[in-house]
């Protein structure tokens, strides 16, 4: 979400940061591009607790009180696809609330301190897929082929 959601709808803009979502909206808004975010109230995720650490299955605790995850859970604990374009002028939707950021690095111990990004949903995304309870993906165990160059060759060297 920190990559695809428009950075101008978060606190990233105060830090002078931008992302793919913002660039796509600025340069391709008339091309039918749709920014789709993701949120979950609780479940499990595959991530590492710091850069360079091994991946592991981690528990994702319920969304923080007042966060978008909590609000969507309280609205009915079923999965939802929210089309947000028509909510851009509705104060209930444009209010900035915390939205959980889970990436390849995630540490539930810092859940209340650094895993939430203040977000105006309809300004950040065109749509949001909300899964009330998510389950981590199962890793694919790829067997490398010795005589074939890596997929990123030569850039991955």
Q: Which ranges hold each PLM region?
A:
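C-terminal regions of proteins
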Residues: 3-157
């Amino acid at each position: 979400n920190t990559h695809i959601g428009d950075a101008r709808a978060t606190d990233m803009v105060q830090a002078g940061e931008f992302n793919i979502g913002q660039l796509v909206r600025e340069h391709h808004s008339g091309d039918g591009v749709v920014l789709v975010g993701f949120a979950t109230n609780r479940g499990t995720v595959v991530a590492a607790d710091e850069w360079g650490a091994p991946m592991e299955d981690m528990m994702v605790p319920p969304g923080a009180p007042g966060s978008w995850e909590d609000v969507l859970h309280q609205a009915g604990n079923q999965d939802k696809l929210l089309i947000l374009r028509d909510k851009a002028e509705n104060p209930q939707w444009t209010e900035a609330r915390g939205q959980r950021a889970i990436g390849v690095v995630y540490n539930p111990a810092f859940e209340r301190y650094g895993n939430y990004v203040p977000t105006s949903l309809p300004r950040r995304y065109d749509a949001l897929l909300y899964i009330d309870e998510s389950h981590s993906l199962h890793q694919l165990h790829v067997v490398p082929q010795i005589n074939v160059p890596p997929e990123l060759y030569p850039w991955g060297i």
